[in-house]
Amino acid sequence: MKPMATRADVRRIALKLPKVAEAEVGFAFSVPDKKGKLKGFVWVWMERVVPKKPRVPNPGVIAVRVANLGQKSALLSAEPKKFFTEPHYDGFPAVLVRLDAVSVADLKVLIAEAWRCQAPAELAQHKR
């Protein structure tokens, strides 16, 4: 059985990618666009545990950017034990990933693809 992913794996994988910035507060990673604006590609899921109360970080789940809503739908349909969504993410190209259900190898692919979605084209092309 493949080892399941952890937040430490997320951090290690994300920080190996070019020009990645880790958030000073919270658990999130981004890459600057051409103008220097940070574009998030992986972050902790902020779960609403109690209705009408603030969302709280769920350390076992990350949100990962995907290329488009078609890819999101495909991931959600193919592996619902690994990937899910919630109404907050309706119409937004990201999936929620259960870390205890995804292998480190799969996590590497997800994070690299998420980074490519947000990185400037010239930077993303060098990483291929």
PLM features per residue range, with description:
Residues 1-128:
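Charge-dense, helix-prone N-terminal extensions
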